[in-house]
Regions:
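Extracellular/periplasmic Venus flytrap/periplasmic-binding protein
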Residues: 83, 127-129, 136-244, 282-290
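Short, charged, surface-exposed loops that flank catalytic or proteolytic processing sites
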Residues: 322-334
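C-terminal segment of classical bacterial N-terminal signal peptides
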Residues: 7, 15-23
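Bacterial N-terminal signal peptides that target proteins for export
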Residues: 1-9
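Beta-alpha junction/loop-to-helix N-cap segments that form part of ligand/metal-binding clefts
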Residues: 28, 43-50, 58-131, 140, ...
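Extracellular/periplasmic periplasmic-binding protein-like sensory domains
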Residues: 142, 241-311, 322-325, 370, ...
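Periplasmic-binding protein-like
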Residues: 33, 88-101, 121-123, 166-171, ...
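Solvent-exposed, acidic/polar segments of extracytosolic/periplasmic ligand-binding ectodomains
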Residues: 29, 340-395
Length: 395
């Protein structure tokens, strides 16, 4: 009997050491990634996805656990995004949501965040409505509309060839475009910048033929255009404007950074677009230079603003989870407040006051690219750097 008990105990001990490799292994920390992978901004969504994936790979683990990304296509449609978010949280068990390209989608998700009860960090939404929107909603990514407008207006005022012009304002007809237009108009008025149409033009997102708008701009006599178009559309508009001879007389200022692959497709027609943004691969510091080469080696595509600020946003989220010490929603949210990541464009800090990031940014102009490892023919040349304090908002 004693021998039987001894054998039984030995078998039980053996089983304990055989099973735990899987049974007792730490479960991964699941993060839901919401980006547009089909439709008009699919390329921008892909670049965001690349940045987040690169951050997850380089971070490796949080809380000693694997980071597992669950990626869903929002199709830039708010109802679709909300449904996908519910799937990520309720079915997949994601502890945080990250990404989101458009302001409309971001605001729709924010309305449902109490029900979802997980932190949501956008790496691309630019609407000023995100400031202090909800205790679980954060921004660490593309400059907000007010920050972009400040950078663009500072750039205009510092350059006589831009300052002494009359601007025709045209935006995409949805929440982000309206907000971007309003922000520019307010600052233009404060700084004495002439505007032709204070009731700015609103173009449907699906617009492909810009000829009627270009004809109106030419007829107005304006010699500057302030445009708030989705990233991927900017080079399309510029190409058509060049075909109509508009660019010979007009300077283009953009409220969003143009996509690098679209710039390549537009070629010389895309020269001369000014705009404030977080970053371009012309930013020259050791961290930026190293990051862009790592990105290039991994994805074999031109490093983009969308990719880099999504990378930085993801790093802020992952580090906040580490700081929280667990995956509780309120604990992660508390850790996100005031967190800082020192990355390719310097320190990016999420303000504890309003849950939105503050960071330095650059004013760029698109032009022929110098020799570069990416084979790019067009690039965003850095003209000026703005400090986080200059861009605001004040805290």
């Amino acid at each position: 009997m004693k021998k039987f008990i001894t054998i039984t105990l030995s078998l039980m001990v053996a089983m304990v050491f055989l099973v735990p490799q899987n049974a007792l292994a730490k479960k991964p920390v699941k993060i839901g990634v919401l980006v547009p992978l089909t439709g008009i901004v699919a390329q921008g969504g892909l670049e965001m996805k690349y940045g987040i994936e690169m951050a997850a790979e380089e971070k490796g683990t949080v809380l000693g656990r694997e980071i597992k990304l669950f990626v869903e296509d929002t199709r830039v449609k708010p109802p679709v995004a909300v449904t996908k978010a519910e799937k990520l949280v309720y079915k997949d068990g994601c502890k945080a949501l990250i990404g989101v390209f458009s302001s409309g989608v971001g605001l729709a998700l924010s309305k449902n965040i109490d029900k979802l009860n997980v932190p949501f960090l956008s790496t691309h939404v630019m609407t000023t409505k995100f400031y202090n929107l909800h205790p679980l909603v954060f921004r660490s990514g593309q400059l907000a509309n007010d920050q972009t407008a400040v950078g663009n207006v500072k750039g205009i005022m510092a350059r006589p060839d831009l300052k002494d012009r009359t601007y025709y304002v045209i935006v995409h007809d949805y929440s982000w475009g309206h907000d971007a237009g309003e922000r520019f108009l307010a600052l233009a008025k404060e700084n004495g910048i002439k505007v032709y149409n204070n009731t700015y033009d609103k173009a449907p997102i699906k617009t492909k033929d810009w000829s009627s708008y270009i004809s109106k701009i030419k007829a107005s006599g304006a010699d500057g255009v302030y445009m708030a178009f989705i990233t991927n559309v900017i080079p399309v508009f510029a190409k058509q404007a060049a075909d109509f001879g508009l660019q010979d007389k007009v300077k283009l200022i953009s409220a969003a950074a143009p996509g690098p692959l679209e710039l390549e497709a537009g070629g010389k027609a895309c020269y001369g677009i000014f705009g404030a943004s977080d970053w371009s691969w012309d930013v020259d510091n050791a961290n930026s230079n190293d990051w862009e080469m790592r990105f290039w080696k991994k994805f074999k595509t031109i490093p983009s603003d969308a990719a880099v600020h999504s990378y930085v946003g993801a790093m802020n989220l992952f580090n906040a989870i580490e700081k929280a010490g667990n995956t509780d929603a309120k604990a992660i949210a508390a850790a996100l407040k005031g967190i800082t990541y020192d990355g390719p464009y310097g320190k990016v800090r999420i303000s504890a006051k309003d849950n939105c990031m503050r960071n330095d940014a650059v004013l760029t102009e698109t032009m022929a690219a110098p020799e570069n490892p990416f084979g790019a023919k067009v690039y965003m040349k850095v003209l000026e750097t703005f400090s986080a304090k200059e861009l605001g908002p004040a805290e």
